[in-house]
A protein has these predicted regions:
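Conserved acidic donor-binding segment of nucleotide-sugar-dependent glycosyltransferases
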Residues: 298-299, 303-310, 319-324
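Short His-centered aromatic/hydrophobic patch
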Residues: 84-90
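Nucleotide-activated donor-binding/catalytic signature segment of Leloir-type glycosyltransferases, i.e.
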Residues: 222-245
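Short hydrophobic beta-strand element within catalytic cores of glycosyltransferases
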Residues: 282-286
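Aromatic "clamp/platform" in nucleotide-sugar-dependent glycosyltransferases that forms part
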Residues: 265
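Short alpha-helical donor nucleotide-sugar binding micro-motif in glycosyltransferases
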Residues: 244-245, 252-257
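A charged, aromatic-enriched C-terminal amphipathic alpha-helix characteristic of glycosyltransferases
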Residues: 325-374
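Conserved donor-binding/catalytic core segment of Leloir-type glycosyltransferases
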Residues: 7-9, 129, 169-187, 193-196, ...
């Protein structure tokens, strides 16, 4: 029997650089035996012994010639289903894809650019996958989507660990704290940095792992000496890791974490949270509207703290470190959440229901230069707006991190 064909268009397939690539690989692992999968990726991923056909295409080249290249690939491959995982050019040409193809886009973030390109041209898309209830609400409001079945909430999943050793973690004398957000504004890096500085002023024993980028905004500017987190955090023996590691090493660290710290301002549905929870841990998240709130219940399977409060982080960490016995139930509850709500069986079931749905788009049309021009213009206004917002965030981070260093010296 001939397998149906899925074309997965992704902004990244090269692991180690973020959740979108991880999502793509997990997607392929789940569907590769049931479907014939083709990949189009924006990055320079190099296959290593894979039997999956992979195309490379610049998703940010909005020329009509590049759009035609993508349409030619679609015409030659003749997929039954196309998944758009943050592939910007595909969002723009959605109105020109053949009507018989089911088109599903994935919104990897609760709002902002990743959500914009998932909902762009929504009337020509059959379904949109949101990773959270907050993300679904944002898409409905932003793109005025009235159809109740247009957007489906399908949480990420994580393969379970055969023998998570919770008991050894509970019995540790020195607890491991892991923050996996690098210097990201969305992960509240500056708030976490300030909290760590306060925590390091105590004599409490712990091990800290800061995973991800350590270069702060303005780090390449030759007129400043404050270039990375290393210039702000002291040389303290309790800091065990500062900087990026491979995905495999990150998974090992997350598996062994006691306290998982990710008080994000915005999220889709963080894979790192699931990677930590499947080993049993105490997750700490913020009360900002993002996907983590869909699965974390305060003091049951995690801790929820006020957003933008470094003192709340410090107080919570100190309380856990000093009164660890009062929190050990969270280890098993977080693991149970993964095993009962976020496993591959549930994800597969929801995805297959989505794939069996009838096509749900208005009639698509032929590509013309004038129609394409106006769609590109609209997309570029999104990107310009995002660029301005991002520069403001970068300026805030530039000032805040240097303020922290100034406070240390004075």
């Amino acid at each position: 029997m001939k397998l149906k064909k899925i074309l997965l268009c992704t902004s990244s397939y090269k692991t180690g650089g973020g959740g979108i690539a991880s999502y793509a690989h997990d997607f392929v692992n789940q569907f590769n035996s049931a479907y014939n999968i083709i990949i189009i990726t924006h990055d320079n991923y190099t296959p290593s012994g894979s039997d999956i056909k992979i195309y490379h295409l610049n998703m940010n080249d909005f020329s009509i010639n590049n759009a035609k290249k993508l349409l030619i690939i679609i015409d030659e491959e003749k997929p039954d289903i196309i998944f758009n995982s943050n592939f910007h050019l595909l969002s723009i040409i959605s109105p020109f894809i053949p009507n018989n193809i089911k088109l599903i886009s994935i919104s990897h973030f609760v709002n902002d650019k990743l959500a914009w390109f998932a909902g762009f041209n929504a009337q020509y898309i059959d379904n949109i996958i949101s990773l959270s209830t907050y993300g679904k609400h944002y898409l409905e409001q932003k793109f005025k989507i009235k159809q109740p079945d247009k957007i489906s909430i399908i949480y990420n999943y994580i393969p379970s660990i055969s023998t998570p050793n919770i008991l050894s973690k509970i019995n540790r004398n020195i607890l491991k704290i892991v923050y996996p957000g690098g210097c990201s504004f969305y992960k509240s890096a500056e708030i976490v940095c300030k909290a760590i500085l306060k925590l390091l002023q105590t004599n409490i024993e712990f091990e800290l792992y800061w995973l991800g980028s350590i270069k702060i905004p303005g780090g390449n500017w030759k007129f400043t000496n404050t270039k990375s987190i290393r210039n702000i955090l002291p040389n303290d023996y309790r800091i065990k890791q500062l900087g990026p590691v491979s995905r495999e090493e990150a998974q090992k660290i997350l598996k062994e974490t006691n306290i998982f710290l990710l008080p994000s301002r915005g999220e889709g549905f963080p894979i790192s949270l699931l990677e930590a929870m499947r080993g049993g841990c105490i997750p700490i998240i913020s009360d900002a509207k993002h996907g983590s709130l869909d699965i974390i219940t305060h003091k049951k399977n995690g801790i929820i703290i006020p957003q933008n409060s470094s003192q709340a982080i410090v107080n919570t960490l100190i309380d856990i470190l000093k009164k660890h016995d009062q929190y050990i139930h969270i280890y098993t509850n977080s693991l149970d959440t993964i095993n009962t709500q976020l496993n591959s069986h549930i994800w597969n079931k929801k995805m297959n229901i989505l794939l069996q749905k009838e096509n749900n788009h208005i009639p698509r049309k032929q590509l013309t230069q004038i129609k394409f021009f106006f769609l590109v213009l609209k997309a570029r206004t999104y990107l310009i707006y995002h660029f301005i917002k991002d520069r403001r965030r970068q300026l805030y981070h530039f000032i805040y991190f240097r303020y922290l260093q100034y406070c240390l010296k004075h």
